[in-house]
């Protein structure tokens, strides 16, 4: 079987059973019509091909297609046994309905819902983002939840990035993620970040 050709890793830091996932994962930003529009059928065919090749780790985020990526994953994964795959998404942004001219990522995301991103790394922001993701994904839990884009690349300067990192801790966004893990609606937390220095800082903090 092709599945046996993909290496698996076991992650069990807290000795609670852990997560077993393929080293090769599926990053689903393109499912959000990144840089070009694709049809639902093409998105589903791509996901089916990845599944047939043995991929069992699927990563998404509210930002990807302003929710479209999560919705497309919902349509695909609803026919799969939840025990057969690992799913991750991210927090740090709320996607708010808006007029077409105010939409986030014009020229980057094509044919997506009219929504604009609002950065929110607070406790309430994390909880709201997570609930919206559950709804779009059609699931009751997510295996891995990442805090998204606490970095200079996204926020434009070290000062702005540091302010967002402070918000994440001071306004209890980090506590929200720990709370979700304690409630067993997520199994692991991490960072989806573009710079290693921030990853190291978060790990040491």
Predicted regions and their residues:
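Short, surface-exposed linear patches
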Residues: 46-49, 79-80, 108-111, 167-169
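Glycine/proline-rich, positively charged
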Residues: 109-205
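N-terminal binding-site loop/beta-alpha segment at the start of enzyme catalytic domains
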Residues: 1-100
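Short, flexible, mixed-charge acidic loops at enzyme active sites
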Residues: 98-108
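Glycine-rich, phosphate-binding/catalytic loops in enzymes
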Residues: 42-44, 73-76, 104-105, 161-165, ...
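Flexible domain-boundary/linker segments
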Residues: 67, 75, 90, 104, ...
